[in-house]
Amino acid sequence: MEFEAVIGLEIHIELNCPTKLFCDCPNNPGDEPNVNTCPICLWFPGAIPRLSQAALEKASLLCLGLGAELQPRSAFDQKVYYYPDLPKGYQLSQAHLPLARGGGIDITDENGRPKRLRIHHIHMEEDVAKLVHEIEGRTPISLVDFNRAGAPLVEIVSEPDFRTPHDAMEFLKALRTQVRYVGASECSMENGTMRVDANISVRPRGTDQMNTKVEVKNMNSIRHVGDAVAYEISRQSACVSSGEAVVLHTRLWDPDRKATFPMRAKFEGPCVPDPSVPFIDLSPEWIEKMRARLPEMPAARAERFVARYGLTDEEAVYLSADPETASYFEALIAEKVAPRTAMHWLTTQLLAAVRERGQELSGTPVTPARFAALLKMLAKDEINANAARQVLIELFDCGESPEKIVEARGIRQVSDHDALEGLIDRVLGENPAAVADYRGGQGKAAGFLIGKVMQASGGKANPKIIRELLTKKLDALG
């Protein structure tokens, strides 16, 4: 029997707000443990939460950027469960009246066909504290860091539209791009600002039944999500084929063993309305005000890059996948760099050098103005491509302009015809055998002679002009 998977994702995204969701404590989970706390996020008796306006606005922009419909009224509930990371015994979430419904992301499936992956709803909630497990002597202990307690989150709950690991990975890549564009979050699984749980079940291909699902956690990268989903599909298919029942429970992904392992029985605590946080009522005027703050989104930007700059669809999508890269590209265009030159050197040279140094494009010392000055020297044949790559590396380590670096290193390209003709005449006189080979029909001899001219010029000669002048002289010899 052939099986297909039914997959839904639950994605928690930490909003990059300065304070927590219901208090004024700094939203800096990485600080020294338990310094960013107050009676509200520790939930002392009598502490009254106050919803952060900044968090509401960031969450609303995120929802609108994903095509979701902000609801006129949403509310917080108490999601009840007992665990050391939640001292009050419940988490403030939006179980019944979420902030937004609908929306979705368009991807391309494994066969190159467009596919819409829908979002069921998006809600806000507070994060829980962080548990740190250590060994003291021979005794295992668990410590609790409340810096993260109360951090502002949104949870995106998808429809079960996913069928393959590819679907899940492409959805997450596109989601990450969309969220970064609206400026709501860094959205990094590696840094914990995006956390993903996958709900997976299998069924006979061609049927529409919904079978028992298994939740998978502990996936710390998009690649891990793909690997975990693939493993779980295989595991459940084998279970069903052998007549074994799939039991509702939660499993952990182990990236070292590339397998999932049972964690606990699946438990959903009761949710009851919270009386301490007022309803969130959004007027049509407020929603339109938020919509007006949306930036140009990736798909629209890619379309504009194709229409305005003549890029291919693939090039435009690649550039617009990251807002910093897209903005840097347009800054080069504003500096009068040709679009194709800007695209090629940005994607093949600068980004590679930035990654090699562990930097971010926004923080690199190679500003668009400095990089553009280098590329314009290349376009004017003042330097060759090899020299441009050398100068680019130096731009990371010094504050000099490309022009001064070129002068200091003496690598300005020689394009003067008279000077180059003198070099060519000398090389032809010193290499009569190669000249005879060329006249005898061996075209590769021209490449040898060009190399000799480049060597004689110390690598400074313009190779395009050398080829043109050398070929003309050789052909004139008959």
Swiss-Prot record:
PROSITE patterns: GATB
Pfam families, alphabetized: GatB_N (PF02934), GatB_Yqey (PF02637)
EC number: 6.3.5.-
Swiss-Prot/TrEMBL GO biological process terms: glutaminyl-tRNAGln biosynthesis via transamidation; translation
Domain of life where this protein originates: Bacteria
Catalysed reaction equations from the record: L-glutamyl-tRNA(Gln) + L-glutamine + ATP + H2O = L-glutaminyl-tRNA(Gln) + L-glutamate + ADP + phosphate + H(+); L-aspartyl-tRNA(Asn) + L-glutamine + ATP + H2O = L-asparaginyl-tRNA(Asn) + L-glutamate + ADP + phosphate + 2 H(+)
Molecular function terms, GO-annotated: asparaginyl-tRNA synthase (glutamine-hydrolyzing) activity; ATP binding; glutaminyl-tRNA synthase (glutamine-hydrolyzing) activity
Alphabetized SMART domains for the sequence: GatB_Yqey
The entry's keywords: ATP-binding, Ligase, Nucleotide-binding, Protein biosynthesis
Assembly and interaction partners: Heterotrimer of A, B and C subunits.
Protein family: Belongs to the GatB/GatE family. GatB subfamily.
NCBIfam families: gatB, PRK05477.1-2, PRK05477.1-4
Alphabetized PANTHER family for the sequence: GLUTAMYL-TRNA GLN AMIDOTRANSFERASE SUBUNIT B MITOCHONDRIAL AND PROKARYOTIC PET112-RELATED (PTHR11659), GLUTAMYL-TRNA(GLN) AMIDOTRANSFERASE SUBUNIT B, MITOCHONDRIAL (PTHR11659:SF0)
Function (record text): Allows the formation of correctly charged Asn-tRNA(Asn) or Gln-tRNA(Gln) through the transamidation of misacylated Asp-tRNA(Asn) or Glu-tRNA(Gln) in organisms which lack either or both of asparaginyl-tRNA or glutaminyl-tRNA synthetases. The reaction takes place in the presence of glutamine and ATP through an activated phospho-Asp-tRNA(Asn) or phospho-Glu-tRNA(Gln).
Name under which the protein is recorded: Aspartyl/glutamyl-tRNA(Asn/Gln) amidotransferase subunit B 1
Gene: gatB1
